[in-house]
Amino acid sequence: MSSTQISAWNAAGTWEERGHTIWAKARIEELVTENGTFELVGGNGIDADARVRIVGVKSCEGDASVVMIRGKPRRGFDFELTLNWEAAFASGGDDDEQDVIIKGTVHVPEFSRDGVEDEECACEVKVSDRNSEHAPRENTCVATLKKRCEDFLVRTLMTIDSELEERASK
């Protein structure tokens, strides 16, 4: 039975909800980790080759569903996300020195269909275990994510919305 069809118990076709949360959570993680790599804002000199990238989803709470109302599918999703990010910088010193790895999170309080319609998705960027020795690099990572992450998240929202619409019509 396709999701545009109604189940036997709902022969009148007034209302029926189908969950797509498991699919949406997996798809969000796939999209953000595959596409979440950004060149540093103002990256130059020794750090010119550095990138900041989303490495995983720390938490993803919420749901996604398609609701059939009088035979018409209505899709919706609403999640709260916390994404892990990291950036690696060459040590710039002796070959024996370790690269500098900076890590943090991007918190997205509302990753929902409303963001698609409004074309916005606010986020908060944090650095884990700040180190004054690496403050300029940490600040560059935060600035990069603040500048580039909203557009990236809106594109991801649009992809999820479009794919959920396809799932609703099957």
Residue ranges and their predicted role:
Residues 1-27, 31-170:
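Long protein-protein interaction modules used by eukaryotic assembly/scaffold proteins
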